Amino acid sequence: MSTLGIRIRWRAATDCMAIDGIPRYAWGVPTKTYGQMCPLARSLDVLGERWTMLVIRELLLGPKRFKHLLAVLPAIGSNRLSERLRGLEQAQIIRKNTLPPPAAVAVYELTEEGERLRDPLIALGLWGLDLPVDDRIDPQTARAELVALCLAGTQTKLLDPGRGETVEFHVGDEVFHFQLRHGRFLPRSGPSPTDPTARIACDLQTFMDLALRELTPSQALKDGRATILAGSRSSLAEVFRVLAYNPQAPLPVHA
């Protein structure tokens, strides 16, 4: 964002102060606020409610229907999910859209403003990879596509900006794909809408072992833990050259 844009937003925020001194932002009025002009505090006014960032997390993987969001976040409940979606719409972080035929269903998707949260949330997810797992966490909630979402932004310097391809993964019951576009590796839920360059199958443990560098792609193929359903055998190594977790890698920052 330009310096002028930042100045305009700052002026808009200060011009919209309530009588009690609580800022009411022109691009979405939080129901709760820390009441501070600190940019981090103002960000938390919009994103700090429980479940909000997890809703955004799902939309980083592509547009989602209400029932899909409820299925992957069952503890949120339909009423609270509706509230969170409404708040994110008011903040212009998400919008409603209708998928083209033959689907022709209503979905929620990120706006350009919402897409700007990709790198900050990926950085937060990478930080979380090193945290100990609380005993109260249900291991059945583990999903390969969420790990892939966090890792996809860490090694983009290894990507050729001129390449354009799609790799589809079948990990247990999960199906997701990566779109390599303009030097970015973007994970998306569901099968690829076009014929993928490669299609790969493995179980969740194998995917995690590959991502955490506890298993090499060649060994996974040799042991039968991973299968190339379509495309070249080298595609598995290419994917995990980018996805493999490197705790020393700098956090993702993109223009």
Name these PLM-found stretches.
Residues 38-77:
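N-terminal helix-turn-helix DNA-binding core of bacterial DNA-binding proteins
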Residues 48, 100-124:
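Basic, amphipathic "hinge/linker" alpha-helix immediately C-terminal to the N-terminal HTH DNA-binding motif
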Residues 193-255:
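C-terminal interaction segments
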Residues 179-181, 188-196:
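Non-DNA-binding regulatory cores of transcription-related proteins
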Residues 81-91:
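Basic amphipathic alpha-helical segments that dock to polyanions
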Residues 1-31:
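Short, intrinsically disordered or compositionally biased N-terminal tails of bacterial proteins
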Residues 113-184, 233-255:
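Acidic, aliphatic-rich amphipathic alpha-helical segments
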